[in-house]
Amino acid sequence: KHSKLPAFGSPRFAKFAVDEDPNVRGLIEAETPVVSIFGKSWDLHVHRALGITEQENLKLIGETVAYLKAHGREVVYDAEHFFDGYTANPDFALRTLEAAKSAGADVLCLCDTNGGTLTVRLMEICAEVRKRFDGVLGIHPHNDSDLAVANALAAVESGFTHVQGTINGYGERCGNANLCSIIANL
């Protein structure tokens, strides 16, 4: 009744204009009401994986969100590796959220992509983000340290209302947050 299945992909690639990027075109052609895009929020990955500047990365995020919004989509921005990125360079990690929010993202979702953020630290970071951003905030925890459910519940306790997970925690590596456990605890 309240769940929505989104199309899922990345912001445009640097070598394409947003309206010419095959991935972004595919997100539109999927005809889902919701699109979730994951963007780099750790400067390490911006430089090493994408080979672009921080400013270019912010532009990719903002242009893609704005384009999807112009096509009538609800947009969830998944800030990939947010907690590691925030630990390394909080200013840049927060600027990725600002780029998405300023372009019209409906949800800002913080991803613990490596699944290694301890719950106390996660709550501290969530509190800082909550102070800076209005609107719907979300959490996407992985279970590498066996903390995905605890971290999802901690984010909810911090005022986050959007929780991403899977049934029984199935997912890459050690899995994602187990929605069956989260729902029962809430």
What are these regions (language model features)?
Residues F8, D78-E80, C111-T113, H140-H142, ...:
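Structural motif
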Residues L5-A7, L68, L186:
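Generic structural hydrophobic/aromatic packing signal, biased to beta-strands
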Residues G39-S41, S158-G175:
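Glycine-rich phosphate-binding active-site loops on the catalytic face of alpha/beta enzymes
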Residues F13-L137, A152-F160:
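Alpha/beta enzyme core
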Residues T119-L122, V149, N176-C180:
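Short alpha-helical patches at coil-to-helix transitions and adjacent helical residues
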Residues D144-A150:
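Short glycine/serine/threonine-rich phosphate/pyrophosphate-binding segments
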Residues Y170-L186:
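C-terminal helical cap(s) of enzyme catalytic domains, especially alpha/beta-barrels
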Residues K1-A17:
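N-terminal capping/small domains of soluble enzymes
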